[in-house]
Amino acid sequence: MEEDHPTTYRFDPKTVALIGKYQSREISESLSLLARELERRGLTVIVEKSTAESASSPEFERWARCDFAGIGQRADVAIVLGGDGTMLNAARQLAHYCVPLVGVNQGRLGFMTDIARS
C-alpha cells in the first residue's frame, strides 16, 4: 500500500557515472573499487572522460568513458568523488540534464560532499 502513496519515490538506477577529482591517486583507487562493486551489483558503469584519463590505473580501460554531455544523456545517477569544488563543477556541467548527484568527500571538510570515503 505504501507504493501508492503520492510521496513515495522509487529510484532504481541502471547506469552510474563516476566523476572524480583529477590527478588524485587516492581517488583513482577509490573509483576503481567503487566501479567494481557497482558492476558486481549488476549496474553499468561509465567514467567521466577526464577522470579516466588522469587515473593512474590501466583498469579504467574496461569502463566506458563519456564527457559530461554523454553522462547527462546516459547516466541515471552520478557519484562524485572529491571535494566541494569537484561537486560544484559536476553540478554545473550536469544541471541541464537533471542527473542526480551523490557526493563522496575525499578532502578534509565537505559541505556538499558529506558522505565519507570510508
Feature annotation, model-predicted:
Residues 1-77, 118:
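ATP/NTP phosphate-donor binding region
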Residues 53, 58, 63-118:
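Small-residue-rich beta-alpha loop regions that form the catalytic core of phosphotransfer
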